[in-house]
Amino acid sequence: MKTKQILLLGICAMLLCPTIEAAERWLEGYKKVLVIGAHPDDPETMCGGTMIKLRQMGVEVVSVYLTGGEAGIPGKSHEESRIIRTAEAKKACEAMGVRSIFLTQIDGNTEINKARYAELEALIEAEKPDLVITHWPIDSHRDHRVCSILVYDAWRQSRYSFDLYYGEVMTGMQTQTFAPTHWVNITEQHEQKVKAYYCHKSQDMPLVQEWHDAMEILRGMECHTKYAEAFTKQVWTE
């Protein structure tokens, strides 16, 4: 979707969306947040501004990576790519002031099975977050879908012990049919977010920035600010 089309959608949505003061009230009260992404750079691009804002609010934030980005650098072996991409992710986390954790799945070959559920559930039990943010489940990238399913099922298995929200990554190309329920003003955090995800030097970050800047302008228009990130809350169900 082109930038002009995104801006037009934002203009149409402005009258229906909340003010930023109302939109951000949902962040209040959290003490520990996990952002669980499929690959190095997913948490940073999905909600790096919100992660930075939470840290500024005194909240503990942990960036969790399902894989090490093993398939993410053409011409490199899985092991070479993993070493490079995890190092980049650690630098990005340092730039945001958050802690990083890497799980053991393989980029491009993620699995849903008992062992993978156990790995994620053990992490959540050890960290005890009160908020988890992960991928929206409708996505063109299989690893993103796998990550979302694992987190959703872990949430149900925990008997809803934490709030679960979904974020978006390159909406229209990867995230599909995303309908936000909550927004965060990241105008003051935008520059720091961009610097953080540019730590991923092995990736095409100018393309990512072009895409996410347009998304953040759209989400900002929806809640009457310059840049924003958007989320959808998972409602409790039996």
Model-based region annotation:
Residues 40-42, 68-71, 106-110, 138-140, ...:
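Solvent-exposed loop/turn segments at secondary-structure junctions
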Residues 70-98:
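Glycine-rich phosphate-binding loop and adjoining beta1-alpha1-beta2 segment
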